Amino acid sequence: AWNRRSRSCGGVLRDPPGKIFNSDGPQKDCVWTIKVKPHFHVVIAIPPLNLSCGKEYVELLDGPPGSEIIGKICGGISLVFRSSSNIATIKYLRTSGQRASPFHIYYYADPEGPLPFPYFERQTIIATEKNIP
């Protein structure tokens, strides 16, 4: 079970606010699905990452696994994203032999309604490196 802070490789997270840490274990692909109460949106805050672009990156999806990929992020920027529903997914992917770089990502629940400050919207494409597959 995930309890506000986790170094586990993936899972379903239902208790915002929280903080996700990447796993330094053998897993190459980690998927966290964040579900908040109906009539709320998921807000994801990603500080600047320092991942080895091309070998590891984070994907941000607007909805459950299999939803539209909003962007692939490996470094250079910080961002805040607000989902279009009460579900968002974060994936961490790395190639075999690539040691996991440390990172953390925050998530929150935000009620429906006007945005209190600028968020990256669904149509925003986030890419910090051109060599990400």
Curated annotation (Swiss-Prot):
Show the segment(s) annotated as Heparin-binding: 73-110
GO biological process terms on file: single fertilization
Gene3D superfamilies per UniProt:
Spermadhesin, CUB domain
Source organism's superkingdom? Eukaryota
- List the keywords (alphabetical): Acetylation, Disulfide bond, Fertilization, Secreted
Give the residue spans that cross the bilayer: none
Q: Give the matching InterPro entries.
A: CUB_dom, Sperma_CUB_dom_sf, Spermadhesin
Show the disulfide pairing: C9-C30, C53-C74
Q: Where is the CUB domain?
A: 9-110
Chief location? secreted
Q: At which residues is N-acetylalanine found?
A: A1
A cellular component term from Gene Ontology for this protein is: extracellular region
PROSITE patterns, per database record: CUB, SPERMADHESIN_1, SPERMADHESIN_2
**Compartments, record wording:** Secreted
Q: Matching Pfam families, A to Z?
A: CUB
Give a short account of what the protein does.
Mediates the binding of spermatozoa to component(s) of the egg's zona pellucida by a carbohydrate-binding mechanism. It is a secretory component of the male accessory glands being coated to the sperm surface at the time of ejaculation.
Instruction: Family membership, please give it.
Output: Belongs to the spermadhesin family.
What name appears for this protein in its UniProt entry?
Carbohydrate-binding protein AWN
Native species: Equus caballus
